[in-house]
Design a protein with these regions (language model features):
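Generic C-terminal helix-cap and adjacent flexible tail
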Residues: 126-131
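Intrinsic-disorder/low-complexity coil detector
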Residues: 5, 13, 19-21, 120, ...
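An amphipathic alpha-helical interaction segment
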Residues: 1-15, 58-60
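Basic/polar phosphate-binding segments, predominantly the helix-turn-helix DNA-binding elements
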Residues: 34-38, 42-78, 98-124
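A short, Lys/Arg-enriched amphipathic alpha-helix from helix-turn-helix/homeodomain DNA-binding modules
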Residues: 13-43, 49-52, 76-92
Length: 131
């Protein structure tokens, strides 16, 4: 995944299954763990800010300062990375994959997928009739 992928401070994006290095900021670390565990659910920065008892603005700023990503950029990027993994298995249709990784709107999934990969999901892994 290359096109619009956020690349953090190091210039590289870690593999999803790698054990990430602990973040220095406890809020950023908590956000990263929460996203990795709950990416398929409806989650929002507001939910996290309430759980961590910090304002959305400060929480997002701390996350971006530590990771190079905004909350929404990382969440969408992580979801698309998971979608690509599921596509490679070839066991599900694209609309099913979209739902499994947390997108309730298939058209929005396509838009975000293209943003982060540079391609439509149908171009990379054609599956015939997807809907």
């Amino acid at each position: 995944i290359a096109a619009g992928a956020p690349d953090g401070q190091s210039g590289e994006t870690p593999e999803l299954d790698e054990k990430p290095a602990p973040l220095q900021n406890k809020y950023a670390e908590a956000m990263m763990q929460y996203i990795r565990q709950h990416y398929a659910e409806h989650i929002s920065l507001t939910d996290l800010s309430q759980q961590l008892n910090i304002s959305c603005t400060h929480l997002n700023a701390k996350f971006k300062a530590e990771t190079g990503y905004t909350f929404h950029d990382f969440l969408n990027y992580y979801r698309i990375r998971r979608a690509v993994e599921l596509q490679k298995r070839g066991e599900r249709k694209l609309y099913e994959i979209a739902e499994l990784v947390g997108f309730s709107d298939y058209k929005y999934f396509n838009k975000v997928y293209k943003k982060y990969t540079g391609y439509s999901p149908n171009v990379i892994f054609p599956r015939g009739d997807e809907q």
